[in-house]
Amino acid sequence: MGKTEQIPATLQERYDEITGLTNQFCQQHLNEEYRDLCRRMAVKLCHKRPSPIATGKTNTWACGIVYSAGRVNFLFDKNQTLHMQADELCQYFDFNPKTGSTKSTAIMELLKCG
């Protein structure tokens, strides 16, 4: 599905890797709305100049993107129908919650959300 989002050619492979991870997580633990939101966030990050996703580990970006989507949608609120702990999310991507939160904060600042 990656090519339809008009990703810069130099970032297509990175985008595909990151969204492959976010897609898998959303399929296993969340839903299609989260999957689509994560994809849109990844597209926006690809279009930043310079794009921050050009460097760093893909699983770090994937974790940060899902964490950010979760923060703005109250995923970590146990009173919501769809919820989970930040620890669970970060563990899936093999990160501690502080790392996930830090990356999420950076992403939210870059995308001016939350």
Summary of predicted features, one role per range:
Residues 1-58, 70-114:
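Basic, alpha-helical nucleic-acid-binding regions used in initiation and control of genome expression
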Residues 61-68:
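Short, structured motif recognition centered on aromatic/hydrophobic residues
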